[in-house]
């Protein structure tokens, strides 16, 4: 009898592991999802679906070098909004980041990095982005611009 009760309790605990409620996506307000579209100051509102897709693609393909918005190869330049704004040309808007993912350049804009940084222009060198669509690039750029609003340590801090 004791074994039967223990088996019944174990069975209930086992099945409770699978009876979870579906997780709802984090609902972000419109202000959080509003990012710069271009250098003229136009803005766009990124959808939650775009942010989710951008995050998935970023984690899948970019975090090897850009974990939490930092840059593994150069700790002085991150994906924080201040660093993106300080680049030449500024990369603190969606269209500039999409352009960078197509034609990467150095932080000062002087050198072409198409053979050094992952991009969609050279799938022969960087197959990671081979299947990225224009929408995927837009989603990743949107995520990179929304991420600092969600994580105070995105791009690094004086402590990390």
From Swiss-Prot:
Signal peptide segment: 1-25
GO molecular function: electron transfer activity; heme binding; iron ion binding
Name of this chain's protein: Photosystem II extrinsic protein V
Cofactor: heme c
SUPFAM superfamilies cross-referenced by the UniProt entry: Cytochrome c
Gene: psbV
Cofactor remark from the record: Binds 1 heme c group covalently per subunit.
Family: Belongs to the cytochrome c family. PsbV subfamily.
Compartment(s) where it occurs, according to its Swiss-Prot or TrEMBL record: Cellular thylakoid membrane
